[in-house]
Amino acid sequence: MTNINYEGIEQMPLRTFTEKAYLNYSMYVIMDRALPFIGDGLKPVQRRIVYAMSELGLNATAKYKKSARTVGDVLGKFHPHGDSACYEAMVLMAQPFSYRYPLVDGQGNWGAPDDPKSFAAMRYTESRLSKISEILLNELGQGTVDYQPNFDGTLAEPQYLPARLPHILLNGTTGIAVGMATDIPPHNINEIADAAVMLLDNPKAGLDDVLEIVQGPDFPTEAEIISPKSEIRKIYEQGRGSIKMRATWKKEDGEIIISALPHQSSPSKVIAQIAEQMTAKKLPMLEDIRDEADHENPIRIVLVPRSNRVDTDALMAHLFATTDLEKSYRVNMNMIGLDHKPAVKGLLEILNEWLDFRRTTVTRRLQYRLDKVLSRLHILEGLMIAFLNIDEVIEIIRHEDDPKAELMARFNLSDEQADAILNLRLRHLAKLEENQLKAEQDELEKERLNLEAILGSERRLNTLIKKEIQEDAKKYANPRMSQLVEREEAKMISESDMTPAEPVTVILSEMGWVRCAKGHDIDPKSLSYKAGDSYLAHACGKSNQAVVFIDSTGRSYALDPLSLPSARSQGEPLTGKLNLPTGATIEYVVMASEQQELLMASDAGYGFICKFEDLIARNKAGKALISLPENAKVLKPKTLINSTALVVAITSAGRMLIFPAQDLPVLSKGKGNKMITIPAANAKDRSELLTKLLLISDQASLEFYSGKRKIVLKPEDLQKFRAERGRKGSTLPRGLHTNLEIMVIEP
């Protein structure tokens, strides 16, 4: 509800006003600022720039004029907005690295791929329209489009331009409206024209038929489009998605040469990103980076590997994953349709709707020409009458006060015919020749018949449109720039893979303090420990391997050895790096390659085989690895040397069982299977436990020590202890039940 008070001020509720104002602003930005029209593929500011330049006579063959002159005309006549925004829109249409088919031909500094906004001010640059702008302008003035008043009502401007090709797909566009945006990628003119022709020949063709012609977007760069065909099809079906581009490179004399970057990637930014990683020592395999770009090679980035042993494919895959050498581009084909409503459209819908636009435009052009031809034929008919009665016509003109009315009455002429006769100069009237008039009449009559035939036949109209599309495509054609190549996904090299693998020893103390020493030739027990502390365990491995800690509850934790303090100190408590369950203590330290198989077991007699990678848990709380029966404890992990290894299990009751390791299940975690029978009640009250667990080859001997007693069991002696997994085993010789030490003697 609104009302006007006595002071002439309109009043309305604030809510109503704000809703109305926001809606009006939203519709204005969507319809008149940010989104392109499907017919000519231009946003209003772009259309006004192109039209203003054509009105200034700045076609492709004209002399260049100051850009400020064009911008002034655009702002003063059609687009009452900021000059910088208008000039920037003009610059984008002139940059060959921004527009696939630039509409403006610029002279001067119009920016560079490294910094598109480094263009000179409009008072310094000069411009004119490019040759390809003809596809938008050539049919103006032929009745093809409707005109509308400009912002102050003093001039008229076209509502849209009569595009002869689907420019909406050729150059694409980007824009941000209110509540919506548009990102339409550019395409190759040959492919789009061929697809349009195919749809004219076969209106029932589907998207798959179109995609046999249109490979995908074609950006103004020779970088590769690496999106799979299935993804590209989905984008063209739904009108939205993401396109991924990757730089092109080659090896040359041991160096890596990057010759093309993804669309809108800055060479200086890419170099800075790589240099930053080199400074942070994250690219030890790379020695140097150079920018060797020149006028012949706008993009030439040289990477120098540290040696010829560097895996260049892995290096580039890492750079693709971590720098702008690989970029993704949002696709959102949102535009104003022929129904003057914004909508996201698929490729097939865009092409079919543009062909409807083109049919309307060509029909209007032909009808406009037909009207002109009919008008001229009508005039010629009057001139022929004048020729046949030349003396009488001259007499009427000389002596009558109103010669026009007399001519119309005497010879039954129309108003237009009489005006045409009277407008002829006397010498032209005297020189009228029947042959000339007849020839022009015959020529125009043929044109009339042809125009009426085309306008009366949809097939002939489509044939004409097809011919014009093919001629224009041939005139402005150029090869595809962005090749479509399916590549493997870029993978970042982990820090551990890039760090040189050095031998390290990780030492754990009784009180849970940990440290890391370089090399394997140290004696962990001889190191200095805190008062009341002493050596508990250690593990040897490489600096690029994880170090795993196993606690008394059966949980495992992993840390990077390089994150541990040096062995020159007394270390740091593990409780500051790991979150152990209440009452739990770290029992063992393990290092191995990720695929190394290990035997995990509890002293209740259960065990299983797992890989070292199954022990790795990067979170501070670790992961549940071994499920322990009640009161059971974890045994030290054993390294499985080969698949034929034998498991030697010895209980505190003096029973020994030997069985193949391959009889144990391979698990990533769990309780495992029974290795040797220990009554559950005995295991629970810990009256009988698994005390010794070994892995040996089938040719190994065992030396048993108990106090001063020593017994050697050779392979043939061990045969009587071999049985199926889970059996009770056989009793060891007397005297080997307590304080037992065992040494494995491999052949």
Swiss-Prot record:
Q: What EC number is given for this enzyme?
A: 5.6.2.2
- Which organism does this sequence originate in? Haemophilus influenzae (strain ATCC 51907 / DSM 11121 / KW20 / Rd)
Q: Which domain of life is it from?
A: Bacteria
NCBIfam families from the entry? parC_Gneg, PRK05561.1
Q: Which Pfam families match?
A: DNA_gyraseA_C, DNA_topoisoIV
Could you tell me what this protein is called? DNA topoisomerase 4 subunit A
Q: Which family does it belong to?
A: Belongs to the type II topoisomerase GyrA/ParC subunit family. ParC type 1 subfamily.
What PANTHER family would the database entry show? DNA GYRASE/TOPOISOMERASE SUBUNIT A, DNA TOPOISOMERASE 4 SUBUNIT A
Q: Which SMART domains match?
A: TOP4c
PROSITE patterns reported for this sequence = TOPO_IIA
Q: Name one GO biological process term.
A: chromosome segregation
